[in-house]
Structures are given as structure tokens and as C-alpha cells.
């Protein structure tokens, strides 16, 4: 089991998915409210996948001043933002379906190349106040964002000073049929003070336990989020 006094993470356990989603929502709501109070505006980065959808739907019901909140993405598949397999589509049809006044900043821009989209993403995040919070996920292979074990670009993505990079995960099972990606890097994550990792199921907990004992980010890229200084990774796990 994961030790409760681990120096890198704080683990919260839930048996009920609704309780899990409501707890994560309360945490995000408080972070966003504090940021708006202090700075006048807040920015939040979200991940795709099936795990966070319930959280996004719950967060969308909260009475926040969404006109003062920017929503960005942790990573994206090289797809049209209108494609149902894109992370942009997921966020639009869960969170933004109700939080209509939020400003959405997708990573893929129609008519631009992958490298141009990466350039624009880096300009956006570099010349704006840093996001106050990020919602991460993790695959059964230990990947987070689009940092896949076995990717030829992984070491470069881990070492780059750029917040976002393009990554080719050809041959990586976790990437499925969408090997080309834009992904947040450890450098980009390092500037975000509140880092939440959302997990569902016993298999994901076992993967996290293995990653904590492994220590090698090339084998378990989730370690890039675990090992960053300045803030613990807050893990919300539901059985």
C-alpha cells in the first residue's frame, strides 16, 4: 500500500464515485475562488480520458464566475477539436456544456501544423499568469499527460524547458491509434501550484504503487509529476 506519510504525494481514498467527484470539485472550486479573489482571474488545465468526466460535470454546476476562468488542456491528440475522440470534445461536452461563460483554450487550431500549435501553446502559457491548478490522469502503463513509456521523444519531453512539446508515441500501446500528441511537460507542470491526480479502480492504485517504488520516469512517466518540487501531488483515488 501507499504510505500515508509519503513525501511526494497526499492520497485520499473514496468508495463512492459521487463522493469522489464532489470532493475533487470542492477542492477545485476553492482553488479557483481564491485565485479569482487574489488575481482577478483563474486558469485551470484539464486532462482527457474517461476518468475525469464525472468531476467536470459536477464542477460545471458550481456557481463560479466562469467569465473569469480560462480552461486549457494538459494534452491533446492530433485531431480536430470537433472530433469526438479529442480531449477538447470531452471538456466541451462535460464542463463547458453548462459553464458556458468560461474561456476555452484548445491546443489544436484548425489550419495550423502540429509544430505551429505547440508554438502557440507555449506563447499562450508563457505570456499569461500560470494556471493555478491542473487535473492529471494516469494510464495503466504509468503515463500521464501524453508522456508515454517507450516513446522515442520521452527523454526530450522530460528534459525540455518548454511548457509544451509535440510527441510521437508510435508503437506505444497506451497511445492507441493517435500517436501524434501535444503534451504538457514537467517544466510546464512545475509552475502550477495545485496538482491533482484522479484515479479510479484498484489497477490504477497498483500502478501508482509500482511507480513510487520504481523511481525511473522513463518506465513510469507519472514519476515526473510525483518528483516535482514545490507542491505535493494530491491523489484522489476511488475504488
UniProtKB/Swiss-Prot annotation:
Keywords: Hydrolase. SUPFAM superfamilies: NagB/RpiA/CoA transferase-like (SSF100950). It holds the Pfam family Glucosamine_iso. GO terms for biological process: carbohydrate metabolic process; pentose-phosphate shunt. InterPro entries: 6-phosphogluconolactonase_DevB, Glc/Gal-6P_isomerase, NagB/RpiA_transferase-like, PGLS. CDD domains: 6PGL. Its EC number is 3.1.1.31. It comes from the Bacteria. Pathway: Carbohydrate degradation; pentose phosphate pathway; D-ribulose 5-phosphate from D-glucose 6-phosphate (oxidative stage): step 2/3. It catalyses: 6-phospho-D-glucono-1,5-lactone + H2O = 6-phospho-D-gluconate + H(+). It is an enzyme of class 3 (hydrolase). GO terms for molecular function: 6-phosphogluconolactonase activity. PANTHER family: 6-PHOSPHOGLUCONOLACTONASE. Hydrolysis of 6-phosphogluconolactone to 6-phosphogluconate. This is 6-phosphogluconolactonase. The gene is pgl.
Amino acid at each position: 500500500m501507499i504510505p500515508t506519510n509519503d513525501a511526494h504525494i497526499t492520497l485520499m481514498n473514496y468508495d463512492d464515485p459521487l463522493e469522489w467527484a464532489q470532493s475533487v470539485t470542492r477542492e477545485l472550486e476553492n482553488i479557483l475562488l481564491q485565485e479569482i479573489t487574489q488575481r482577478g482571474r483563474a486558469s485551470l488545465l484539464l486532462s482527457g480520458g474517461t476518468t475525469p468526466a464525472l468531476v467536470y460535470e459536477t464542477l460545471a454546476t458550481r456557481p463560479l464566475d466562469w467569465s473569469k476562468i480560462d480552461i486549457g488542456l494538459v494534452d491533446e491528440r492530433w485531431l480536430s477539436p470537433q472530433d469526438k475522440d479529442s480531449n477538447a470534445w470531452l471538456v466541451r461536452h462535460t464542463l463547458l456544456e453548462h459553464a458556458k461563460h468560461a474561456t476555452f483554450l484548445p491546443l489544436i487550431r484548425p489550419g495550423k501544423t502540429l509544430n505551429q500549435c505547440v508554438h502557440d501553446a507555449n506563447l499562450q502559457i508563457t505570456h499569461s499568469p500560470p494556471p493555478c491548478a491542473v487535473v492529471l490522469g494516469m494510464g495503466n502503463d504509468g503515463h500521464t499527460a501524453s508522456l508515454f513509456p517507450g516513446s522515442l521523444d520521452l527523454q526530450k519531453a522530460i528534459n525540455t524547458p518548454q511548457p509544451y512539446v509535440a510527441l510521437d508515441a508510435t508503437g506505444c500501446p497506451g497511445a492507441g491509434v493517435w500517436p501524434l500528441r501535444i503534451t504538457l511537460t514537467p517544466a510546464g507542470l512545475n509552475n502550477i501550484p495545485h496538482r491533482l491526480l484522479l484515479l479510479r479502480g484498484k489497477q490504477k492504485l497498483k500502478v501508482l504503487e509500482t511507480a513510487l517504488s520504481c523511481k525511473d520516469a522513463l518506465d513510469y512517466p507519472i514519476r515526473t509529476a510525483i518528483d516535482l518540487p514545490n507542491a505535493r501531488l494530491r491523489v484522489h483515488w476511488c475504488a
